[in-house]
């Protein structure tokens, strides 16, 4: 199950590319929108995300609904883009997720590197993959190397990628290449856990 980031809905190009790319590898992939994004879509008015407890509650409801429909031997992997992945990381252990995938984890708010969102990551028990751009303004490679993270967390760095994995032209890479590499990494990770 993939959750969107704070500003873009579940049908943003990023979310579509990852959901369809992972489905093409044989994985069953679902997406959902948090209530604030559903309201934004229905009314057309921009709304900020709800506070973390309400977002965690939404995740728990989605997980319960999915568990009611999946085979007993099915594995439940949760995650998402930026905020969606962060909130998934907050509920993964309590919800007994079989794995966690974070795409562009917001290690700190934009422009506030001193306000880290990493404390819970040190004790995370769910097998976790974080796919991150090396230039991500919410946690670049240099900054993240100094954080204490659980041994269950594996990081994969996308060369010259920003928060949405877009590289600079001078890097010689394209956004599509980084997305494709990210999809391949996620699929490989999920096949190993």
Q: What does each of the following model-derived ranges do?
A:
Residues 2-74, 92, 162-175:
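Serine-hydrolase catalytic machinery in alpha/beta-hydrolase-like enzymes
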Residues 145, 149-193:
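C-terminal catalytic histidine-bearing segment of alpha/beta-hydrolase fold enzymes
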């Amino acid at each position: 199950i993939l959750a969107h980031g704070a500003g873009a809905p579940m049908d943003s190009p990023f979310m579509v590319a990852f959901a369809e790319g992972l489905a093409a590898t044989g994985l069953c992939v679902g997406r959902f929108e948090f209530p604030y994004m559903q309201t934004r879509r229905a009314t057309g008015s921009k709304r900020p995300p709800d506070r973390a407890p309400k977002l965690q509650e939404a995740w728990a409801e989605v997980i319960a609904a999915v568990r009611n429909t999946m085979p007993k031997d099915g594995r439940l992997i949760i995650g998402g883009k930026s905020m969606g992945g962060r909130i998934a990381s907050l509920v993964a252990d309590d919800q007994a997720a079989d794995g966690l995938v974070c795409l562009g984890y917001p290690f700190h708010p934009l422009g506030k590197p001193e306000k880290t969102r990493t404390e819970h990551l040190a004790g995370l028990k769910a097998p976790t993959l974080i796919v991150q751009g090396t230039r991500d303004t919410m946690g670049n490679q240099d900054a993240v190397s100094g954080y204490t993270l659980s041994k269950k967390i594996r990081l994969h760095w996308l060369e010259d990628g920003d928060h949405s994995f877009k590289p600079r032209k001078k890097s010689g890479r394209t956004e599509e290449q980084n997305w494709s590499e990210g999809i391949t990494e996620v699929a490989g990770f999920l096949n190993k856990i």
